[in-house]
Amino acid sequence: MRKKHLREANTKLARDLGVAKVELAQEIQKNEDLTAANGRLVTAVNRQVAVNQNLRSENADLRSQLDTARRTFGEAFVKGSLAPVGPNRPNRQKLTEREVRDIREAYRGGMKQKDLADNYGVNPATISRTVRGIYH
């Protein structure tokens, strides 16, 4: 090749290289823009997932309350009144008069309330109230 042809080829290659650099810069800019948009999108999605989880939790709480209300209404409808609650509700006696006397004697004799509760199959609070005279 002659020098003239080499110069023309070199000029054409330089022009093509310049065009390729411009196109590459444009593609890099597009890539950066897409990366930034993707980051914003991921943040928005994560925020919505958190909101959704909170709504699911609230929904479960409301569903539980609704189930309780339905059950209470059903019981009241069948029985004709609501079931008694609180200190006025009926409570069956766990211990006979004889057992109460035995428990008080054993406690005065030095036996622990926990052991008495285990022996009689009742809650330690029941033994405590029995010993203090709240029950019987």
From Swiss-Prot:
Domain of life: Viruses
Record-given protein name: Gene 46 protein
Species of origin: Mycobacterium phage D29 (Mycobacteriophage D29)
Organism phylogeny: Viruses, Duplodnaviria, Heunggongvirae, Uroviricota, Caudoviricetes
Encoding gene (name): 46
